[in-house]
């Protein structure tokens, strides 16, 4: 199950953090899905701006500390071979707002 919802509304990408039971705290699967949402946004020439928001009355509680504490998830590499950002797209250079 993805915890990130991507919707295109005209030139706007609406990216929703959808893990309200954890106040949208980011764990590895959500970080990967969030990164993919921004890769998708960046690649689509019809989309001009992205709006990131949270479901369930919360924006984001930050990193899910239970998941981040797992030593097996530290020092992972992303698919391009660089360091994996714990929050998904935090280290991605984006050309669009």
Give the residues covered by each predicted segment.
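Conserved CoA-thioester-binding segment of acyl-CoA-metabolizing enzymes
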Residues: 1-55, 69-71
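An acidic, glycine-rich surface segment that forms the CoA-thioester-binding/catalytic face
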Residues: 33-35, 39, 49, 65-97
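Short, active-site-adjacent cap segments at secondary-structure transitions
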Residues: 57-61, 66
């Amino acid at each position: 199950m993805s915890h990130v919802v991507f919707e295109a509304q005209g030139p706007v990408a609406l990216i929703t953090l959808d893990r309200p039971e954890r106040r949208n705290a980011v764990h590895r699967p959500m970080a990967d899905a969030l990164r993919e949402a921004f890769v998708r946004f960046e690649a689509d020439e019809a989309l001009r701006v992205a709006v990131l928001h949270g479901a369930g009355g919360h924006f984001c509680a930050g990193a899910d500390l239970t998941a981040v504490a797992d030593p097996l998830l530290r020092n992972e590499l992303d698919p391009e071979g660089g360091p994996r950002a714990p929050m998904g797209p935090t280290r991605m250079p984006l050309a669009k707002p």
